[in-house]
Amino acid sequence: MKKSTVNIGIVGWMSCISALILLGCSSLRHTLFQSGVLDLGIYDQVVYLISQGMPPISSFLGFHHMGNHAAWAVYPLALLYKIHPSAYWLLAVQAVSLALGALPTWFLALQAGLKERQAIAMAAVYLLYPLVFNVNLFEFHPEVMAVPVFLGVVLAARLGQVVWF
């Protein structure tokens, strides 16, 4: 059992380092004025408006954001904007969400019968998958926050945990 605890620590560290790398790359892109207005700009404005108690009617789109994507996940993000309104919050949440996907991937690999070292390798494969890096680098998309949730739901279904599924 101790070995499994050590390995989840390894996967946890891999996830933390990956989140920092993902955040660093997307922040650098944003700092160099390479961010686009039609993704990060819209969500930055919408989350800011929600944090101020105003209706999320984007000036870019001209209508209520729920009429565009119905992205309910942006409402809790407004709490972060209460601390300090910055698009970097969105980039950080996205980076952490993507990096957290390594944990359920590791558990799924163990549940599928892979050895612990192979399960760690699968978590690393997830983190090194080019799509994970590219989706992080390209603006902000709230659906990315669902990646670890979907992987967790698959794990719950495979474990027969209907309540979590």
Language-model regions, residue ranges each:
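Membrane-interface transmembrane helices that cradle and orient dolichyl/undecaprenyl
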Residues: 113, 145, 151-165
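Short acidic/glycine- and proline-prone juxtamembrane loop motifs at membrane-interface regions
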Residues: 135-143
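Extracytosolic helix-loop segments that constitute the early lumenal/periplasmic catalytic or substrate-binding loops
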Residues: 24, 42-65, 72-73
